[in-house]
């Protein structure tokens, strides 16, 4: 049942859900439905609207009636269309990742006792150690 969702990124799952709902949705509803933080829902909506050209959306801004919070608005979003090209692009990316993983040679680990002080610090500060 879940196999179809494993390869899809969160933004696409959210967009598909919004399109199936066929109504205006706010970030709070997304955070509740997908059990994610509100800020992550807001950031995902922003990503869908600004970066993903294959997803067509309509946007409405409704001002909050809260006093003392400045000019904050609620953003209502409705997904109109999801282009089929996005699925082809994702399939190609997943295939490339699989091919890349298989061809990547395994680099033997160097014991820490063989590294000098500078090399140890360099290793600790490298991006690969922060993952």
Curated annotation (Swiss-Prot):
List this protein's GO terms for biological process: carnitine metabolic process; DNA-templated transcription; regulation of DNA-templated transcription
Q: Does the keyword Transcription apply?
A: yes
- For this chain, the annotated S-S bridges are none
Q: Which domain of life is it from?
A: Bacteria
Record has Transcription as a keyword: yes
Which UniProt keywords are listed? Answer: Activator, Transcription, Transcription regulation
> Per UniProt, what is one GO molecular function of this protein?
DNA-binding transcription factor activity
Tell me the function of this protein. Potential transcriptional activator of carnitine metabolism.
Q: What is this protein called?
A: Transcriptional activatory protein CaiF
């Amino acid at each position: 049942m879940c196999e179809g969702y494993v390869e899809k990124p969160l933004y696409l799952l959210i967009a598909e859900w919004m399109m199936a709902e066929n109504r205006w949705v706010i970030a709070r509803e997304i955070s509740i439905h997908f059990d994610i933080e509100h800020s992550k829902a807001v950031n995902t909506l922003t990503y869908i609207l600004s970066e993903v050209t294959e997803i067509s959306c309509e946007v409405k801004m409704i001002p909050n009636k809260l006093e003392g919070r400045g000019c904050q608005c609620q953003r209502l979003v409705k997904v109109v269309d999801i282009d089929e090209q996005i699925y082809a692009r994702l399939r190609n990316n997943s295939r490339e990742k699989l091919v890349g993983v298989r061809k990547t040679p395994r680099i033997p680990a160097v014991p820490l006792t063989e590294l000098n002080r500078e090399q140890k610090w360099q290793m600790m500060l490298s991006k690969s150690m922060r993952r």
